[in-house]
Regions:
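Basic, polyanion-interacting recognition surfaces, primarily
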Residues: 1-109
Length: 109
């Protein structure tokens, strides 16, 4: 939902982010990077904690190191098992978590 806000601790305090502005989240050791349309945030929350906070059906844990917002997916490269995002970035998909069919079903639902 558009009103869904998420609060993340940062080095200097905390940030309030609209869930729908998050493109993807990436694990960085025990920390995480939250990438939005216009900014990147660094938080002490783990990817699992972020996954538990984001209770939005538009987000998929596609890899042990990535959570992606379905609204920003442009295409899937099955030869590389990567998703291309509308931001121009490419992120990996775990072939142990997803078959091509399961990925299509998950993205379409």
């Amino acid at each position: 939902t558009d009103k869904h806000r998420i609060v993340f601790p940062t080095k200097s305090g905390f940030e309030v982010i609209q869930a729908n502005s998050i493109v993807y989240c990436k694990s960085d050791g025990s920390y995480s990077n939250i990438i939005t349309i216009d900014k990147e945030y660094f938080t002490s929350k783990s990817l699992k904690e972020i996954n538990d906070i984001i209770i939005d059906s538009n987000f998929i844990r596609i890899h042990k190191s990535y959570i992606v917002n379905k609204n920003y997916i442009k295409s899937f490269k099955s030869d590389e098992f990567k998703l291309d995002l509308i931001t121009g970035e490419s992120i990996p998909v775990s072939d142990t978590l997803f078959s091509k069919k399961k990925l299509i079903d998950t993205i379409s639902s």
